Amino acid sequence: MEALLEGIQNRGHGGGFLTSCEAELQELMKQIDIMVAHKKSEWEGRTHALETCLKIREQELKSLRSQLDVTHKEVGMLHQQVEEHEKIKQEMTMEYKQELKKLHEELCILKRSYEKLQKKQMREFRGNTKNHREDRSEIERLTAKIEEFRQKSLDWEKQRLIYQQQVSSLEAQRKALAEQSEIIQAQLVNRKQKLESVELSSQSEIQHLSSKLERANDTICANELEIERLTMRVNDLVGTSMTVLQEQQQKEEKLRESEKLLEALQEEKRELKAALQSQENLIHEARIQKEKLQEKVKATNTQHAVEAIRPREESLAEKKYTSQGQGDLDSVLSQLNFTHTSEDLLQAEVTCLEGSLESVSATCKQLSQELMEKYEELKRMEAHNNEYKAEIKKLKEQILQGEQSYSSALEGMKMEISHLTQELHQRDITIASTKGSSSDMEKRLRAEMQKAEDKAVEHKEILDQLESLKLENRHLSEMVMKLELGLHEAKEISLADLQENYIEALNKLVSENQQLQKDLMNTKSQLEISTQMCKKQNDRIFKPTHSRTTEFKNTEFKPTHGQHRHDGIKTEHYKTDLHSPRGQASDSINPMSRVLSPLSPQISPCSSTRSLTSYSLCKTHSLPSALDTNEANFSDTMSESMNDQEEFISSCSLPVSPLGSIATRFLEEEELRSHHILERLDAHIEELKRESEKTVRQFTALK
């Protein structure tokens, strides 16, 4: 094209003029070159941009695949951590089950030992009941054993209460752990569901994105194929344009040759014109001469007759001259005909060249139309590429959002797992602290039991003092009875002496009663101080409510007035047989009340001392049962044990029943109590086993 343009320009400069077709063709060639160069640069830039976009997308796909692999690895690690936590929980449940089995075995051993002891006691009691009438020493030994068994039963009751406390604490811990495990299981199920939903959504999004990427790849491949097809078409068009350029060059060469021929013909034409002009000049001169000659002939026609020889000669000369002019004219005419034919040929060649130029212009128009169509197709491709870019951006944003949601979900799961591990660690710490606190509680209870035993020893000493006072009161009552008998027998004694003796005896009794009241008040203050100390310690340990303790104190073991009006011999017999501190107190107080009741109303504080001693003794008896008033889970067992204790004390306070019936009743009540306690413990252990099995099943079901 450039060579053709240069040739046309050179021709224009050389020839000095350009036709309109050549100028239009030059402009078209320039526009075609500019458009082809512009489209070529645009296509190169677009192909380079598409290649860079494809490379960037491939890198993004690689990064996304690597991120997906990392997320899959993190999910696997999380699954492993969850499995490890489940294994740890299973191990903890197995340890708890083993501990429960050990406790059950220990309880079974205790049951067996207790049953053996009961059997031995029954055997010994049967053997002793057979030989009771024979040996009083055997009865005392049996009573001592009964007291020992009673103390053991109290110890067992204390141990039972301790075990009940431990079992209640374990049950509370187990319930709390079960609730927490259920909560954790629900949270884990929710988290698993969330993870599954997130995984499903991520998989669906990944599949959707992969399908979109496949579609984009297909569209890219189709675009590449279209680009290749367009490049092929462009190459074909370039080839056709090159062929057209070659044809144009050939035609330009032909035009140059024709132009050269035209120039040569024009020169020949000019020469011929010059020759024609010269011939015309000659012909004109000849005509002028001919006219002159004709004039001369006309002038000489008159002289023709005269001079006949001269006209003939002149005519011959004219004929010769005209023959020569006609030959010259024929040659000039032949040259003119040749120039006309050459002009016609040149015009035909020019028309052919114009037709070829028209065909070339038509082909150029077609090429321009095809280029415009290709430009429109390129615009469409650009629009499609922009749409694809927008879709790819949307896909990238969706992938980033999915990754962010997945990462946030993973971070939330990690935080929850760390929180759960911290909670489990805190629970382990609380379990260890509860174990330590239970051991401390056991130590405190043992110390309190020792203090209670020391106080019981002090109470026994006080009761011994009361026995001595009782003996003195009996001695005084005997003296008073003797005085009354002496009053009836000795009538000669004056009333004044009797009144004086009576007043002196009353004063002695009043002083002794005042001394006894002081001693009892001192003991009462000491007992109140000791009970307050015990109450404070029990409040620190067990935190009982004041209302329950007051009701328990007011309703527990209140002696009736009719229970202390039995025969003194029977109470002494019961006291010596069972060594009951309640019987001792009632025996020590009843003679004073019998002696001093008909004498004066001033000796009524003995009833207060009696109630005080009974209250203090009831305190000593009710101390093991008052330790666990705050336990709501074992209120039924506590009420039953308190009823059993009240029945036992009421049975002990009845001095009418003989020794054998009391012992058999005591043993039967102890057997019933122990059997009932063992049944409750077995039922509670079975419930714990069932609940532990439920928790284990739940954990296994979660797996």
Swiss-Prot record:
Subunit structure comment from the entry: Interacts with CEP152 and CDK1; these interactions recruit both ligands to centrosomes. Interacts with CDK2, CDK5RAP2, WDR62, CEP90, KIAA0753/moonraker and CCDC14. CEP63, CDK5RAP2, CEP152, WDR62 are proposed to form a stepwise assembled complex at the centrosome forming a ring near parental centrioles. Interacts with CCDC57; the interaction is required for their location to proximal end of centrioles. Interacts with FXR1; promoting its stabilization. (Microbial infection) Interacts with zika virus serine protease NS3; this interaction disorganizes the centrosome.
Coiled coil stretches, renumbered: 22-199, 242-306, 353-533, 676-703
Chief location of this protein within or outside the cell: cytoplasm
Designated name of the protein: Centrosomal protein of 63 kDa
Family: Belongs to the CEP63 family.
Naturally occurring in which organism (per UniProt): Homo sapiens (Human)
Modified residues (N-acetylmethionine): M1
Cellular component GO terms held in the UniProt record: centriolar satellite; centriole; centrosome; ciliary basal body; cytosol; nucleoplasm; spindle pole
Subcellular location field: Cytoplasm, Cytoskeleton, Microtubule organizing center, Centrosome; Cytoplasm, Cytoskeleton, Microtubule organizing center, Centrosome, Centriole; Cytoplasm, Cytoskeleton, Microtubule organizing center, Centrosome, Centriolar satellite
Classification of source organism: Eukaryota, Metazoa, Chordata, Craniata, Vertebrata
GO biological process: cell division; centriole replication; de novo centriole assembly involved in multi-ciliated epithelial cell differentiation; DNA damage checkpoint signaling; negative regulation of innate immune response; negative regulation of protein K63-linked ubiquitination; protein stabilization; signal transduction in response to DNA damage
UniProt miscellaneous comment: CEP63 and DEUP1 paralogs are both involved in centriole amplification: while CEP63 mediates mother-centriole-dependent centriole duplication, DEUP1 mediates de novo centriole amplification in multiciliated cells.
GO molecular function per UniProt: molecular adaptor activity
A Pfam family: CEP63
